[in-house]
Amino acid sequence: MDIEPEVPVVEKQMLAGNRGKQKTRRSVAKDAIRKPASDSTNGGNWVNVADKIEVHIHFNF
């Protein structure tokens, strides 16, 4: 039985009009979740190898 973790999806919301600068800084681990080579028994398990995933969004109005 494969174990599939829940991965949050972050979507950038668009503002109506252009009300100043929008600064977005994203610090996301590239390989936060990787699937190792398949195992003959269960097809491999998902392994979370990232300590934390951070997304910082700052708006200046």
From Swiss-Prot:
GO molecular function, one term: RNA binding
Domain of life: Viruses
Basic and acidic residues biased stretches: 28-37
Chain positions covered by the region annotation Disordered: 15-45
Stretch list, region RNA-binding: 17-35
Biological process terms in GO annotation: transport of virus in host, cell to cell
Function: Cell-to-cell movement. Displays RNA-binding activity.
Assembly, per entry: Homodimer.
Name of the molecule in the record: Double gene block protein 1
Lineage of producing organism: Viruses, Riboviria, Orthornavirae, Kitrinoviricota, Tolucaviricetes
